[in-house]
């Protein structure tokens, strides 16, 4: 039993300490074996041997606790030395990249601001006039339905597009006007390609009548799309929007299949990216403008980001899935 304490004194780490403990105090350890030997003894010899075992067991346990404390302090000191941080040294901290939506917004702003477009910011809460009536959306238009629009009790609503900013800008300023607006919009929809909150960018140019033509609009849009997507093909289609006349939609050649046909472009080879047109005179009349002309355009920022990042589910932009966010 003397050898147990001698062995304990030579221990240098927790693993060795546990091995010595089990060898001494375990079910099959030295002291358990000694206690089993008592059954073979009688009388005073048994009592004397039992006292001797208890004496050495208590001595071992006391030495063990002292050694355990010393080992733990030593290991803590070594661990602290290893984990010591020298704040004067450079540490290669992992930095995150820009979120796809922020990257897309910044890229849009970088194109339009050098051309003289002023960035306007509008309210997220609007009234019926600025969100619908001034934009030539009649009372029976389906966009006014409560199934599509978030209404408040005081007849206010969450804007369904960024177009109200155009109305506010024209009310507060006089031509010539060149502006863009980027921001959140809200509609009651949620699926692979729609979310209750999404982002739009709209542009407006207004000047004296005759100074702004459709060819100006066409030039701006084509320059922007080639800047944003590179060497894609463009297709213009006539369309209808209450606030523009004439109106058009613009498609780009599919960035996924290069017009060979795929599920994303419904095997047509084309992807719709934006709507535009010359501002309807009814909009100017609602504002009180006379003898002016202008063009407007609008597009979904998520739509642009989905195409550039090749993301199929719009909801991925707003969910906190690090596997998705770290892939950008």
Curated annotation (Swiss-Prot):
It is found in: Cytoplasm. Binds 2 magnesium ions per tetramer. GO terms for biological process: phenylalanyl-tRNA aminoacylation. Its cofactor is Mg(2+). It holds the Pfam family tRNA-synt_2d. The keyword Transmembrane does not apply. GO terms for molecular function: ATP binding; magnesium ion binding; phenylalanine-tRNA ligase activity; tRNA binding. Its EC number is 6.1.1.20. Mg(2+) binds at residue 245. Disulfide bonds: none annotated. SUPFAM superfamilies: Class II aaRS and biotin synthetases (SSF55681), tRNA-binding arm (SSF46589). It comes from the Bacteria. Tetramer of two alpha and two beta subunits. Belongs to the class-II aminoacyl-tRNA synthetase family. Phe-tRNA synthetase alpha subunit type 1 subfamily. HAMAP family: Phe_tRNA_synth_alpha1 (MF_00281). NCBIfam families: pheS. This is Phenylalanine--tRNA ligase alpha subunit. It comes from Helicobacter pylori (strain G27). The gene is pheS.
């Amino acid at each position: 039993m003397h050898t147990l304490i001698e062995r304990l004194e030579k221990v240098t780490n927790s693993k060795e300490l546990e091995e010595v403990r089990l060898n001494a105090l375990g079910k099959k350890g030295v002291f358990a074996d000694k206690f089993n030997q008592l059954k073979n003894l009688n009388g005073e010899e048994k009592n004397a041997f039992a006292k001797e075992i208890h004496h050495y067991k208590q001595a071992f346990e006391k030495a063990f606790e002292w050694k355990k404390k010393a080992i733990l302090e030593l290991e803590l000191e070594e661990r602290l030395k290893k984990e010591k941080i020298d704040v004067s040294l450079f540490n290669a901290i992992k930095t995150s990249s820009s979120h796809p939506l922020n990257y897309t917004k910044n890229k849009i702003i970088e194109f339009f601001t050098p051309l003289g477009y002023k960035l306007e910011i509008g309210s997220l809460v609007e009234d019926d006039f600025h969100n619908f009536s001034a934009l030539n959306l009649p009372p029976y238009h389906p966009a006014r339905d409560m199934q599509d629009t978030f209404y408040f009790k005081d007849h206010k609503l969450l804007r369904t597009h960024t177009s109200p900013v155009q109305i506010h800008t024209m009310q507060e300023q006089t031509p010539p006007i060149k502006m863009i607006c980027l921001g959140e919009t809200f509609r009651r929809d949620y699926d692979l390609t729609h979310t209750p909150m999404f982002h739009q960018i709209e542009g407006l140019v207004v000047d004296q009548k005759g100074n702004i033509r459709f060819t100006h609009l066409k030039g701006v849009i084509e320059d922007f799309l080639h800047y944003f997507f590179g060497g894609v093909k463009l297709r213009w289609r006539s369309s209808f929007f209450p606030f523009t006349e004439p109106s058009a939609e613009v498609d780009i050649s599919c960035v996924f299949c290069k017009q060979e046909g795929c599920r994303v472009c419904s095997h047509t080879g084309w992807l719709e990216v934006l709507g535009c047109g010359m501002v309807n005179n009814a909009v100017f009349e609602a504002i009180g403008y006379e003898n002016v002309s202008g063009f407007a355009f609008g597009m979904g920022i998520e739509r642009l980001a989905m195409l550039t990042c090749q993301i199929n589910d719009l909801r991925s932009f707003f969910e906190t899935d690090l596997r998705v966010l770290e892939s950008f």
